[in-house]
Amino acid sequence: MLEPFQILSICSFILSALHFMGWTIGHLNQIKRGVNLKIRIRNPNKETINREVSILRHSYQKEIQAKETIKEVLSDNMERLSDHIVIEGLSAEEIIKMGETVLEVEELH
């Protein structure tokens, strides 16, 4: 049986991870918006447009990879910690689903 302090520590860790994940996703979205706003092509030609599209595609792929990595890390940690977390009325699967829901909500913003 876990001590109340241990339970609080685990819950605190999960909340910190969720906060960090939300901040990171928000920060990546701001970078993406900033990149989109800074692109102004003067005298566009096919080469310039292709280069700018390539830069945007690369930035977007990096953002998606970062989100997937965060999701994997959180999911792994939630699965490990769910065996030790007891929230009255919630199963381990429901706790993991809560973490995934937070990720989905953050992705929408």
UniProtKB/Swiss-Prot annotation:
Keyword terms, alphabetized: Coiled coil, Host cell membrane, Host membrane, Hydrogen ion transport, Ion channel, Ion transport, Membrane, Phosphoprotein, Signal-anchor, Transmembrane, Transmembrane helix, Transport, Viral ion channel, Virion
MF GO annotations: channel activity
Record flagged with keyword Phosphoprotein: yes
Native species: Influenza B virus (strain B/Yamagata/1/1973)
Site-annotated residues for Essential for channel activity, possibly by being protonated during channel activation, and by forming the channel gate and the selective filter: H19
Modification after translation: Phosphorylated by host.
Gene Ontology CC terms, in alphabetical order: host cell plasma membrane; membrane; virion membrane
Record membrane topology: Single-pass type III membrane protein
Job of this protein: Forms presumably a highly low-pH gated proton-selective channel. Trp-23 may function as a minimalistic gate that opens and closes the pore. When the environmental pH is lower than a threshold, the BM2 channel would be activated and selectively transport protons across the membrane from the extracellular side to the cytoplasmic side. Crucial for the uncoating process.
Stretches assigned to coiled coil: 59-83
Virion surface face residues: 1-4
Protein name, entry field: Matrix protein 2
Pfam families, per the entry: Flu_B_M2
Intravirion side: 28-109
Compartments, as annotated in UniProt: Virion membrane; Host cell membrane
Other facts noted in the record for this chain: Influenza B virus genome RNA segment 7 encodes the M1 (AC Q71UK7) and BM2 proteins. Normal translation produces the M1 protein. The M1 termination codon overlaps the BM2 initiation codon in an overlapping stop-start pentanucleotide 5'-UAAUG-3'. Termination of M1 translation triggers reinitiation on the BM2 AUG in the +2 open reading frame.
Annotated TM spans: 5-27
